[in-house]
Amino acid sequence: MASPAVSLVCYDLASLVIDAAVVERAFAEAIATQGIVTGTEAYVRSMVRFDRARGRPPADILHDLFGSDESRVQAASLAFDRSFNSAAERFGVTASPETLCALGKVAAAGIRLCLLTSLSRGASGAVLDAITRDVQAELVLCADEVPRGFPWPDPVLTAMLRLGAADVRETAVVSATENGLLSGYRSGAGLVIGVDESRQRIPAMRDAGATVVLDDIAALPELLTAAS
């Protein structure tokens, strides 16, 4: 049986729109409120853990870090939200012209678009408001609006259900992180598309379930058209 045409794109904002360095800085500032500061072994271990978990919700990483100490988890999560919002206000978070052009072509082809983020609504609300002024998305899902975030399949499956995808294979998932790609793979999406401009993480992305890896987001519309 032939695969159905792509009718839905789930686009992970991590790294593709939301700068990974901004998220990392906010995470470092969040754990500093709990006594884990630059120059300590605990800080180095925590940042290594963060780097290896890139793409997962920061709240989940903080749970891993602080375990059952829920008060520290909650305090650090609130600090992360404040720090990220402050950084977004100072430096701005906008989609590149190439990304806007690519997503515009996707929409023009009649393909529905869902934006996914591993951040909470509290952290990313202002950023999402700015992005959706330029990007015509039918749905935006944050990490705290699904049962489980990346790398679980819940974000992608939730998008499929809410937008009425008749077949999981009609969905394409686009991500620049291995955890986002793993979510797409676990959901059964027909296309799992990695984006790696450096071309240094292609093997890791393949291992995470990517069916194809692009080095330029501008190639996305043509890929989706060919798959259809």
Residue spans for each PLM region:
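N-terminal helical cap/lid subdomain that shapes the substrate entry/recognition surface
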Residues: S3-P97
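A broad detector of the eukaryotic-type serine/threonine protein kinase catalytic domain
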Residues: G67, N85, E89, I111, ...
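Short, acidic loop-to-helix structural element flanking the phosphoryl-transfer center
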Residues: P4-A5, S86-L115, R121, G125
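Asp-based, Mg2+/Mn2+-dependent phosphohydrolase catalytic module
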Residues: M1-L8, G104, S120-S228
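Active-site phosphate/pyrophosphate-handling residues
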Residues: V22, D60, C101, G122, ...
